[in-house]
Amino acid sequence: MCRVDDKPASIRLNLALSDIAPVEDYNHRISIFIKMNNPTENGLSSNEEYPILCDIEDEVINRLETLEDIFAGTVKSQGRLELYVFTKNPEKSEELCKEALKKFPDYQWNCSIAEDVKWDIYFNFLYPDIYSYKAMMNRSVIENLMKQGDNLEKEREIDHWLYFYSEESLNLATKKLKELGYNILSSKKMENEADDSY
């Protein structure tokens, strides 16, 4: 869960694209906005409407993939489902979007095409910041542990590393962490560090 324009949002994306994007010749982005008919009070999809929104997404993406378009991600927020796809055939892709969405006459939608050579929408909007990314990876670890029957309530030792630019900051943090019940195993000045980290 995150926020878009200070409103609750759910973003799902293809993280693997970060290693290869921008993909050569895929210079145009298709943005498809579908208005939800029954969103929750916070603008996300309701349990009742979720299955049909999945059907809409599947229909659109499956058609666009026949052109080898690249699905980048979705956003659910403010009563809308947004789909983002990169294409090298913008006109054909737009036609396929329209065909796919005709199957859902009860839904209002809008489709637009824009040049996005650097994949800005992917890297600057869909892709998570460092903290969100770490939360996603932590969630993935927890899910894997649960699948393997791990007892998540079992206490276990966890190591943390902190870096400081001054000895004063180090000492203040050490004092506070000890007050919170943490054990400090070591603290020392880093050797061969140009920035004098502690």
Predicted regions and their residues:
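Long, contiguous binding/interaction regions
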Residues: 1-198
